[in-house]
Regions:
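N-terminal phosphate/diphosphate-binding loop that engages ATP/GTP or pyrophosphate donors
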Residues: 1-41
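Short, structured coil segments at secondary-structure junctions
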Residues: 14, 81, 133-137
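Phosphate-binding/switch loop-helix module in NTP-utilizing enzymes
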Residues: 31-68, 75-79
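Structural motif
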Residues: 57-59, 86-88, 117
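Short glycine/serine/threonine-rich phosphate/pyrophosphate-binding segments
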Residues: 66-69, 95-98
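Inter-motif core of Ras-like GTPase G domains
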Residues: 69-92
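Histidine-anchored nucleotide/phosphate-binding helix
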Residues: 75-79, 97-107
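C-terminal lobe/tail of nucleotide-utilizing enzymes
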Residues: 104-166
């Protein structure tokens, strides 16, 4: 939410990337159901259309249980528009719990999980436990900047192709 959009950052790093317009754009830095209310926007979660594209990366606002409107969360929307998922997480106290809950929620809805991308400085202990417990393959995305973005993006692409068998 807000004017500092991830898509603006990515576009500034990689000019050749196609960024689709948001299905809904909220300015309020809050959960979408709160932003919707504060901005007096009227939309229903299931009316948000996905763009037609051969390759499409969809970034949701927040986690799987982030409310999208007053009745539905991101997981409901993903369940309606089932696409293979890549789960993104970072290393922090409590991340194992959040990751495993997300993996279980995706399994329960029969949403294919291609890989878990862990962002930040690698923590082998966390990776080992998550992999042993869930069986989900893990790839890493180190922090990047404008100078090393293309190198990091290509490394992530290579690793995802290797584990997810695109």
């Amino acid at each position: 939410a807000g004017e500092n959009k991830d898509s603006n950052l990515i576009t500034s790093f990689a000019k050749d990337v196609k960024i689709h317009k948001e299905g809904v754009f909220l300015k309020t830095p809050a959960s979408p159901h709160i932003g919707k209310k504060l901005e007096r926007l009227d939309y229903k979660a299931f009316d948000i259309a996905l763009p037609e594209s051969k390759n499409l990366l969809i970034e949701t606002a927040g986690g799987l249980f982030t409310p999208l409107d007053d009745k539905h969360c991101m997981l409901d929307y993903i369940s309606l528009n089932i696409k293979p998922c890549i789960l993104l997480a970072s290393y922090y106290l409590g991340c194992i719990n959040h990751i495993l809950l997300s993996i279980e929620a995706l399994k329960q809805r029969q949403i294919p999980l291609l890989a878990l991308v862990m962002s930040g400085k690698k923590d082998e202990d966390i990776d080992d436990f998550v992999f042993k417990y869930s069986g989900v393959k893990i790839v890493h995305l180190e922090h990047f900047n404008k100078e090393n973005f293309r190198q990091k993006a290509l490394a992530l692409r290579r690793d995802l192709i290797n584990v997810a068998k695109f």
